[in-house]
Amino acid sequence: MKKSNPWFVFFWITLLVIVLMFINFARQGGNEVELEYSQFKQHIKAGSVFKVLVAPGLIRGQFRDGDGVFKRFKTVPMDDPNLVKDMEDNKVLEFSATEKSGWLGSLLLNWGPVVLLILFCFWMMRGMSMGNKQAMSFGKTKAKLAVGASKKITFKDVAGCDEAKEELQELIEFLKDPARFQKLGGKIPKGVLLFGSPGTGKTLLAKAVAGEANVPFFSSSGSEFVEMFVGVGASRVRDLFDHGRKSAPCLLFIDEIDAVGRHRFAGIGGGHDEREQTLNQLLVEMDGFDSKEGVILIAATNRPDVLDPALLRPGRFDRQVIILSPDLKDREEILGVHSKKIRLDNDVNLNVIARRTPGFVGADLANLVNEAALLAARNSQNAVNMKNMEEAIDRILAGPQRKSRLMSDKEKNIIAYHEAGHTLVAKFLPSADPVHKVSIIPRGPALGYTLQLPEEDKYLTSKSELLDKLSILFGGRVAEELVFSEITTGAQNDISKATGIAMRMVTEFGMSDKIGPMALQRPNEEVFLGRDISRDARHSGKTSELIDEEVKNIIYSSKSRASKIIKDNVSILNKIVSYLLERENLSGEDIDKIIKGEELAPLSESSSVDEETKKKSTVEKKVINEKVIIS
């Protein structure tokens, strides 16, 4: 319900008071001339009275004085039975009589404004009182209570992360039957910290624990504790734990706890920082409540490195559960959970989709299924097919297609050679991931892309794999140089990635023969976390020169490998470009056939490439076959 504006109410009350006062003033007569009754009779006989109102106890009217000025008058009536006859004889234009007014009307007109002013003052004081109550409510927690929800989340709704479920199963058993643990003298963890990459399902897992245990679930965000008023955060922490004790057994969940639990400052800002006060109160509360009370705190973050050590010590967050990105088996299970909500065609293979989505977390997979459903609905399909799933993967990885972007034939050739260079180098390097798809259709910010997908989940990367990745990144630039004797800005992102990989190989991974296994680069930590007030150099200037030299050697040697592969396979490069300009998309199987010297099957009539594109690609194919590659 919309609250009324107090100034709006104030305006109307003031206006009403003014109107009543004006009416009362008009009723009292304002600047009226008081006449004796005899004078009143004389004016009637003189014919100067033209309006008379006879009321009980008072006569009012208007007359014209000797100067011809109209004036209002009043007089006290006498017992005069000839008054009406005299007014008729002297042609008084207007005269009337009124009945005796009631005491209620007189009281309203006389005391109404005063009563309204009193009521207005009372209303203002009441508003101030409510304002004080609202100010006091700042200290109340904003945690949302979920109990007996119609859509209860359980472990069946959380696919994958089996190890995390096992770690949390003890909490569920304790919340269901705390006496079994207390009888043996065991103590259940007071707090559990869930940490992992964004989108891995930390919040969903916490809700599933509450759903499995069937206990109240208070959920809050770390940012909700800190407000503009000092002391509000600490008050909300106290109120949250008070609610938990009253509803025990229950779960308290704080999402993104790094917003309030960051490492305390090293004297900067003093001890009165609001976030620090809130953290101190949280530490006190976690010490103050006993695990026997049946209140368990679960927190989630994707930045455990910035949390205060006092928050992570035993007795507070006793158990820390890492939620890893799902592997192949987990991804297939997650896809199965989300695909239950949509209608799938028979050609959809969730195992194939899971293999094509390495690195995808739960949120990415949920988005993939939803994107595929939207694409199917856009095409008025009855079910989601495999083509929709593959297009959804491309949209997530590279962005939506930008078919409306018009490019000249020259730029299209450059992009085709650039992507063909990446593809060719990737196919001839032993440690490179297989090429899944290459396209010259603009997607998102990219004008074209080469998609490589690993055959299995990897947790380690070898030096040879990194060197091959560098050569693949330079494949596009090398192809441009050899074919057009010109370089463009299209390789900007490739060069940036390659430089970053080479720098980490030298300074972090210890993969330089000259420098050796030394960590020369400080990890990515934020300044002012109470750990480092200033950055100090971890190596000398001479070592910095050596680092630059080693990075340069790695980059140039990788580029030379890419150049040799492309020069030795110019004919294959031209064929890949020819088919790319004709079809715009090539699969990994198509690339394998081209390298083997096989011809690709002609485009079907239902292909999305129109006749004009086919004619243009034929002309471009002739130009490509006649092009001379400069060694």
From Swiss-Prot:
HAMAP family in the cross-refs: FtsH
Binding positions (ATP): G196, S197, P198, G199, T200, G201, K202, T203
Protein known as: ATP-dependent zinc metalloprotease FtsH
Subcellular location: Cell inner membrane
EC number: 3.4.24.-
Cofactor(s) recorded in Swiss-Prot or TrEMBL: Zn(2+)
GO molecular function: ATP binding; ATP hydrolysis activity; ATP-dependent peptidase activity; metalloendopeptidase activity; zinc ion binding
CDD domains xrefs: RecA-like_FtsH
Residue ranges annotated as Periplasmic topological domain: 27-102
Tagged with keyword Glycoprotein: no
Family: In the central section; belongs to the AAA ATPase family. In the C-terminal section; belongs to the peptidase M41 family.
TM segment ranges: 6-26, 103-123
NCBIfam families (alphabetical): FtsH_fam
Any one Pfam family match given in the protein's UniProt record, by short name: AAA
Organism: Endomicrobium trichonymphae
Active site: E419
Role this protein plays: Acts as a processive, ATP-dependent zinc metallopeptidase for both cytoplasmic and membrane proteins. Plays a role in the quality control of integral membrane proteins.
Intervals, Cytoplasmic compartment: 1-5, 124-631
InterPro entries named among the record's database cross-references: AAA+_ATPase (IPR003593), AAA_lid_3 (IPR041569), ATPase_AAA_core (IPR003959), ATPase_AAA_CS (IPR003960), FtsH (IPR005936), P-loop_NTPase (IPR027417), Pept_M41_FtsH_extracell (IPR011546), Peptidase_M41 (IPR000642)
